[in-house]
A protein has these predicted regions:
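Hydrophobic, aromatic-enriched alpha-helical segments typical of multi-pass transmembrane helices
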Residues: 2-224
Length: 224
């Protein structure tokens, strides 16, 4: 069946995208899990013994947060791949590039976080904090693990490109596109400025992905 479009400027009213409830649910759930993990994560220097001791003081919370991030990253990946269907024509390639970068970053982040969180958890109570730090530093300097974990930096970059593509495409409301742009910047600020409350800094991520999930679930394109 052929779907027709009415054009208002460059905005497509209606869409060929079909409702996709599974990717929508994955996108929303992934954002909630990642946001929860970020809010739980200990902030500060990760290359000192004092940080290791902080992990040892709350090992269960540490592991839970990293498992949340791992599962959330995979769910985000599954949800992100449905987003290009929301965009027709204008901005579609930019959105596709952003989704690709973010998906690769999400997969890398998921693997790296689970490995990092599990190792630190397993060492709690088994070796002194100084030795635990030494073991972790040696392991994470291995070329294979570096190759697996480094692409995680593509996740925030991909989100920024995705937001720019959505803004240019006019396929979604402008406030939503701006939320997608702001979300990774807010999270990075939360990491850099310890005085900022991380639960507040992850709200743009949850709001943006939740809003996108609604559009994916409906299979519609709304314009600005």
């Amino acid at each position: 069946m052929t779907t027709t479009f009415e054009r208002q400027g460059d905005i497509a009213v209606g869409s060929e995208a079909k409702p996709r409830r599974a990717p929508a649910a994955a996108l929303a759930a992934g954002a909630v899990l990642c946001a929860s993990a970020l809010a739980m994560h200990l902030r500060g220097g990760v290359e000192d013994v004092e940080f290791v001791r902080r992990v040892e003081a709350t090992p269960d919370a540490w592991l839970t947060g990293h498992v949340f991030m791992g599962v959330g990253g995979i769910l985000l990946l599954l949800g992100l791949v449905a987003l290009p269907r929301l965009v027709q024509g204008r901005g579609r390639r930019v959105v596709a590039v952003g989704v690709t970068l973010a998906a690769v970053g999400a997969a890398s982040s998921a693997l790296g976080d689970v490995a990092h969180g599990t190792l630190a958890y397993m060492l709690v109570g088994e070796v002194p904090a100084e030795q635990s730090l030494h073991i972790q530093e040696r392991l994470y300097s291995q070329p294979l693990l570096v190759a697996v974990s480094m692409p995680a930096m593509l996740l925030p970059l991909g989100m920024i490109v995705l937001g720019a593509g959505l803004l240019y495409s006019r396929a979604v409301p402008r406030p939503l596109a701006l939320l997608v742009l702001v979300a990774p910047i807010a999270v990075q600020l939360g990491y850099m400025v310890i005085s900022l409350p991380m639960p507040l800094m992850v709200l743009p991520l949850v709001a943006a992905m939740g809003w996108l999930a609604l559009l994916v679930a409906r299979g519609t394109q709304t314009g600005r």
